[in-house]
Amino acid sequence: MLLFILLLLLSCHVLWLWRNRRFFNLYRKVGSRFPFVPFMGHGYLYLTNGEKVLNNLFKIGDHAISNGGMSTTWLLHRFYLMLADPVDAGYVLKHHLEKDELMLLIRYFTRTSSVFAKVAIWRPRRKIVSALLSHKNVSKFEPVFAKNSEVLVEQLRPLIGKEAFSIWEHLNAYTVDITGSTIFGIDVNSQTNLMEPLRLAINGIMELAAEVLLQIWYHVEFLLKRSSIYKQLLEYDHVVKCYVDKALKKHTDAASRRIKNDIEVPDDDHQISLLHLFAQLKEQRGIDHTTLYDESLGLLMAASDTTAVGASTAAAMLAHWPDVQEKAYQELYEVFGDTDRHMTIEDLPRLKYMEAVIKEALRLYPPAPHVTRKALEDIVLPSGLSVPKGTNFLISAYALNRNPKYWGPDADEFRPERFLDGSLPDQSLTIYFSFSYGPRGCPGIQFAMMSMKTSLGTLLRRYRLLPATVPNTSRGSAGPTAPLRFLFGVVVKEADNFPVRIEARHGK
């Protein structure tokens, strides 16, 4: 009996190898950081906690850097070719737009939002979303960013000189408030109430999505839809839907009275919202209620979560690198002096060092460190590697942003000056992948950068950021080399929730 079982398993494995021989040949040609296990592939790397899963992916990225810009991994039966060279990665992201089946699992959480949707759904919507998030439209939101940044610093005032706290909790509330205002045109007020239902629902959805990706059995739709996770998802979805429906009714009623021919932002600033613009397009371009809801949900989740993690990462890095923080503060002082005036859209281009700090923090720790694509046909990469149809690509922004071939020998160091001193390669070669790249790259880069510069700038004008614990002076002023520990997710989270301390500047 035992012999029969062993022979059956061996036969199944041989059959599997035969059916996947093209992928397995590519796996052997490229190589991998970890040994292959029959029936599991590298699945054992992902049957653990979120921190170890992410670290294993980072190790595969490190192997790709040292292996000519590529490595491989198997998630059970799914084969992935990881890319860490910008030429190959840029080619895939520009010409191969379909995401893999694993990312399509996220559709249970984002519905048909174009962020994770199939190309057939994404393509007709991309121009609309890009137009809504244009610089012209997003610039109108700066008063919202400035107003909520002032609320942020006031909410932090009681924490001056106290023990460490999670800066992410407050920046997450800030981003939920600004996305509520800019997307829905409603005041959420989660900064003054950290238990606000919309904020909890958004964060809950993202946590559930991460759990589904980590637990392989949830990759089976039948099991997922009968799980407690799915029941909880429906409860969170109902909370978000109530907010969206309320805002949709407000804006569709207004749009029905005044249909415009072009995408315009109203002159009255308090009316500005992306949903208002969506509603104007509802009848003009055949956008139905479901599309409005799904796109609003996707924008809300993407804008609030990624921006909060990005701003929190930059804040934590500033706390650990006081010399960098002082340079950023001096730049702010040159722009604002001793005044307490709000930040304006005209101020943002002058904050070049602050922008470099944010870019450098996100270079080292991109909020979405991996992007997937799927080859729908046989292709040849610019490097000359032949890739068979059906191959899943794992584009590692983490490895791409740390590849010393392009970033230099100090690629793992936190040095914002690299974006200002002309040391980077010619801009014709894209080497910065923190916001992805190509047609399906992040359409909200302007929104994210403006909101982060505003919140961090306002924060530094009032407070000095300090590490959660008193740093070891033997490390010098640069602080520890790896102060942050991240957990796997659709958008990564810091294991300790970005703890910092603050002290007032000049009695402010």
Regions found by a protein language model. Name each.
Residues 1-13, 73-81, 136-147, 157-181, ...:
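Cytochrome P450
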Residues 2-110, 120, 124, 146-155, ...:
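N-terminal membrane-proximal hinge/A-helix region immediately C-terminal to the signal-anchor transmembrane segment
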Residues 44-68, 342-383, 496, 505:
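Conserved cytochrome P450 K-helix E-x-x-R motif and the immediately C-terminal K′/meander segment
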Residues 131, 302, 421-455, 483-487:
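Cytochrome P450 heme-thiolate "Cys pocket" and heme-binding signature region
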Residues 134-136, 236-310, 344-346, 418:
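Conserved cytochrome P450 catalytic core segment spanning the I/J/K helices
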Residues 175, 179, 184, 236, ...:
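Central I-helix of cytochrome P450 enzymes
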Residues 322-324, 393, 445-491:
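Cytochrome P450 heme-binding "Cys pocket" and the immediately downstream C-terminal segment
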Residues 365, 395-423:
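Conserved cytochrome P450 K-helix/beta-meander segment immediately N-terminal to the heme-binding cysteine loop
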